[in-house]
Amino acid sequence: MKHLSIFGSTGSIGQQTLKIVRSLPHLFNVVALASYGNNKDLFIEQIREFSPSIVSVYDEQLYFEIRKEFPEIQAFLREEGLMAAATAEEIDMVVAASSGVVALPAIIEAMKSGKVLALANKEVLVSAGEIIKEFAKQYQTEIFPVDSEHNALYQCLEGRNALEVKKLLLTASGGPLLHKTKEELAHVTVQDVLKHPIWHMGAKITVDSSTLVNKGLEIIEAYWLFGLENAEIDAVIHPQSLIHGMVEFLDGTVLSVMNPPNMLFPIQHVLTTPKRYPAPHKGINFSIKQTLEFFPIDEERFPSIGLARQVLKNKGSSGPFFNAANEVLVQRFLAEEIAWCDILDKLTRLMENYRVFACTSLEDVLAVDEEARALAQEI
């Protein structure tokens, strides 16, 4: 039985993780739950159903409610709670399903404590990939990617000779604005952007999907996850989202992972690896006609891919700056302060004017994160 700690349990990935736990109850024990959002009722329901021994919240009122209703549970606030949920002795695996870098210090402590890391938080690797890799090497941390694309690449690469890999290829659905003209893009609304044709995700990642910043972040994430210095990392539009990642080898052979666009597939793989179990979710129906399409990404229309490549070239502080600046610009778009087109325009300007420096500590990362947020709020 695996003993789990779940960061971001009320978010999309957190809820789906608990769905897998619910479907395979003999395999898992939920030791800790951490919530950053405002979904108090859902979090209380999760506590009642899964009976964790540790909970962490950011809302002070909810903290006192939990202490009153569940006196037997160790309840914590904010950073102290994340640390407890990351390092408790009985925990085997930490599922990092939160967004942003708020959980970064706790994730590092989990690695130091010898936990297996199920990483669904791409911002952590984008902002602190070099630091995470150093800690993973030092503490021999197993890191399993939960993102569907990186999970697919992981499965394709497992047991393979890294020197034989030519290219890692991530797929992108193209997002909700794939077929919009340049003129139409100038007038898209928040409601337009949040209507994703394939995936049901949180607002921030749905906006990132529309700008393809999400794919840029994933290119950076793939670099730090797999460390294949000689392999090219690229992305391609695949509207059906049935193939999630591909690995091309030196002989031209391509391996891919296929499943319906449902995060339950990669989540179950990570939670149950190295074994496989019957799933409550259905696979691809090959008895009906299926179409697989692939298109190159128009990098002039979507400069996010080029910006991501620049981040990988510069490394250092460019990763946390890129991530934090984009996050604020997305928040401003969702608040209807700026237009959709402004996200990439302003992000490009911020990146062009930013002077990169070596980023060697957690404190450096958090300082850059704070600076980028301030600049992105002002531009």
From Swiss-Prot:
<protein>
    <recommendedName>
        <fullName>1-deoxy-D-xylulose 5-phosphate reductoisomerase</fullName>
        <ecNumber>1.1.1.267</ecNumber>
    </recommendedName>
</protein>
<feature type="binding site">
    <location>
        <position position="173"/>
    </location>
    <ligand>
        <name>1-deoxy-D-xylulose 5-phosphate</name>
    </ligand>
</feature>
<feature type="binding site">
    <location>
        <position position="149"/>
    </location>
    <ligand>
        <name>1-deoxy-D-xylulose 5-phosphate</name>
    </ligand>
</feature>
<feature type="binding site">
    <location>
        <position position="149"/>
    </location>
    <ligand>
        <name>Mn(2+)</name>
    </ligand>
</feature>
<keyword id="KW-0464">Manganese</keyword>
<feature type="binding site">
    <location>
        <position position="196"/>
    </location>
    <ligand>
        <name>1-deoxy-D-xylulose 5-phosphate</name>
    </ligand>
</feature>
<feature type="binding site">
    <location>
        <position position="148"/>
    </location>
    <ligand>
        <name>1-deoxy-D-xylulose 5-phosphate</name>
    </ligand>
</feature>
<feature type="binding site">
    <location>
        <position position="11"/>
    </location>
    <ligand>
        <name>NADPH</name>
    </ligand>
</feature>
<dbReference type="InterPro" id="IPR013512">
    <property type="entry name" value="DXP_reductoisomerase_N"/>
</dbReference>
<feature type="binding site">
    <location>
        <position position="122"/>
    </location>
    <ligand>
        <name>1-deoxy-D-xylulose 5-phosphate</name>
    </ligand>
</feature>
<feature type="binding site">
    <location>
        <position position="209"/>
    </location>
    <ligand>
        <name>1-deoxy-D-xylulose 5-phosphate</name>
    </ligand>
</feature>
<feature type="binding site">
    <location>
        <position position="39"/>
    </location>
    <ligand>
        <name>NADPH</name>
    </ligand>
</feature>
<dbReference type="InterPro" id="IPR036169">
    <property type="entry name" value="DXPR_C_sf"/>
</dbReference>
<keyword id="KW-0414">Isoprene biosynthesis</keyword>
<dbReference type="Pfam" id="PF08436">
    <property type="entry name" value="DXP_redisom_C"/>
</dbReference>
<dbReference type="InterPro" id="IPR003821">
    <property type="entry name" value="DXP_reductoisomerase"/>
</dbReference>
<dbReference type="InterPro" id="IPR013644">
    <property type="entry name" value="DXP_reductoisomerase_C"/>
</dbReference>
<keyword id="KW-0479">Metal-binding</keyword>
<dbReference type="GO" id="GO:0030145">
    <property type="term" value="F:manganese ion binding"/>
</dbReference>
<keyword id="KW-0521">NADP</keyword>
<keyword id="KW-0560">Oxidoreductase</keyword>
<comment type="pathway">
    <text>Isoprenoid biosynthesis; isopentenyl diphosphate biosynthesis via DXP pathway; isopentenyl diphosphate from 1-deoxy-D-xylulose 5-phosphate: step 1/6.</text>
</comment>
<dbReference type="Pfam" id="PF02670">
    <property type="entry name" value="DXP_reductoisom"/>
</dbReference>
<feature type="binding site">
    <location>
        <position position="214"/>
    </location>
    <ligand>
        <name>1-deoxy-D-xylulose 5-phosphate</name>
    </ligand>
</feature>
<comment type="function">
    <text>Catalyzes the NADPH-dependent rearrangement and reduction of 1-deoxy-D-xylulose-5-phosphate (DXP) to 2-C-methyl-D-erythritol 4-phosphate (MEP).</text>
</comment>
<feature type="binding site">
    <location>
        <position position="218"/>
    </location>
    <ligand>
        <name>1-deoxy-D-xylulose 5-phosphate</name>
    </ligand>
</feature>
<dbReference type="GO" id="GO:0030604">
    <property type="term" value="F:1-deoxy-D-xylulose-5-phosphate reductoisomerase activity"/>
</dbReference>
<feature type="binding site">
    <location>
        <position position="13"/>
    </location>
    <ligand>
        <name>NADPH</name>
    </ligand>
</feature>
<feature type="binding site">
    <location>
        <position position="12"/>
    </location>
    <ligand>
        <name>NADPH</name>
    </ligand>
</feature>
<dbReference type="InterPro" id="IPR026877">
    <property type="entry name" value="DXPR_C"/>
</dbReference>
<feature type="binding site">
    <location>
        <position position="202"/>
    </location>
    <ligand>
        <name>NADPH</name>
    </ligand>
</feature>
<comment type="similarity">
    <text>Belongs to the DXR family.</text>
</comment>
<dbReference type="Pfam" id="PF13288">
    <property type="entry name" value="DXPR_C"/>
</dbReference>
<dbReference type="GO" id="GO:0051484">
    <property type="term" value="P:isopentenyl diphosphate biosynthetic process, methylerythritol 4-phosphate pathway involved in terpenoid biosynthetic process"/>
</dbReference>
<dbReference type="InterPro" id="IPR036291">
    <property type="entry name" value="NAD(P)-bd_dom_sf"/>
</dbReference>
<feature type="binding site">
    <location>
        <position position="121"/>
    </location>
    <ligand>
        <name>NADPH</name>
    </ligand>
</feature>
<feature type="binding site">
    <location>
        <position position="215"/>
    </location>
    <ligand>
        <name>1-deoxy-D-xylulose 5-phosphate</name>
    </ligand>
</feature>
<feature type="binding site">
    <location>
        <position position="123"/>
    </location>
    <ligand>
        <name>NADPH</name>
    </ligand>
</feature>
<feature type="binding site">
    <location>
        <position position="10"/>
    </location>
    <ligand>
        <name>NADPH</name>
    </ligand>
</feature>
<feature type="binding site">
    <location>
        <position position="147"/>
    </location>
    <ligand>
        <name>Mn(2+)</name>
    </ligand>
</feature>
<feature type="binding site">
    <location>
        <position position="218"/>
    </location>
    <ligand>
        <name>Mn(2+)</name>
    </ligand>
</feature>
<dbReference type="GO" id="GO:0070402">
    <property type="term" value="F:NADPH binding"/>
</dbReference>
